[in-house]
Amino acid sequence: MNDVPILYSFRRCPYAIRSRMAIAVSGVQMQLREVVLKNKPPELLLTSPKGTVPVVRRVDGSVLEQSLDILDWVLSISDPAGWKAYPSDVLAEMANLIEENDVSFKQHLDQYKYADRYPDESKETYRARCHTYLQKLEDRLSVQPHLFSERVSYADVAIFPFVRQFSKVDEQWFAQAPYPALRNWLGRFATGDLFISVMKKYKPWRQGNPSMLFPSI
Ligand SMILES: N[C@@H](CCC(=O)N[C@@H](CS)C(=O)NCC(=O)O)C(=O)O
């Protein structure tokens, strides 16, 4: 199996979900190693000492330690749905929207999700801080079905798992929140075959376990 890249992943991690979606759509096959974050296998830490997932170890031994690098790599090999088939100025706009997600929205999301760990402010205050970004997404989605056009892009896939996390913090609140287009977009992704296929459960990997090919054939 030395000729197949290795993916260290954690099922519910939004960064890992975006990577698995891109890997699955590209068809670039990997050996999936499901990780328990509280008990990381030494092989992961040897491959990438910073200890976050997702991580890909390529066949030549080089390591990708950032989810977006994994997306870029597999889509550069195969991008059958044209997720990155956009003009360079649009790709730059996508990169900005993703960066805002990964930097500020993610921070507000964590504070909202784990509000009990951040007693300085109320859960509602943390949720309100998520609004500027979510409204930006809502504005885009109220004029087109996906963030940058009629069809799915790299940005939709990179951002969707985080909006999903937001929606799950208080599902009742989200169901009546002022984000109808965002809800619709989220619902289409969350019930789509691609997302469902990448959420399959795998047992945590340990040295000596048989390799699990992902996407499975
Ligand atoms: N910038 C990284 C972030 C990855 C990340 O933070 N992953 C979380 C899980 S969602 C993690 O592995 N945290 C380490 C831990 O909880 O020990 C990426 O894009 O891949």
Spell out what each predicted region is.
Residues A22, F174, G192-F195, Y202:
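A structural signal for the main folded, soluble domain(s) of proteins
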Residues D69, A181, L194:
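Residue-level recognition of oxygen-bearing side chains
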Residues I77-A81, V169, G192:
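Phosphate/oxyanion-binding loops and surfaces in catalytic or ligand/nucleic-acid-binding neighborhoods
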Residues Y202-I217:
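Acidic/histidine-enriched, glycine/proline-rich intrinsically disordered or flexible terminal extensions
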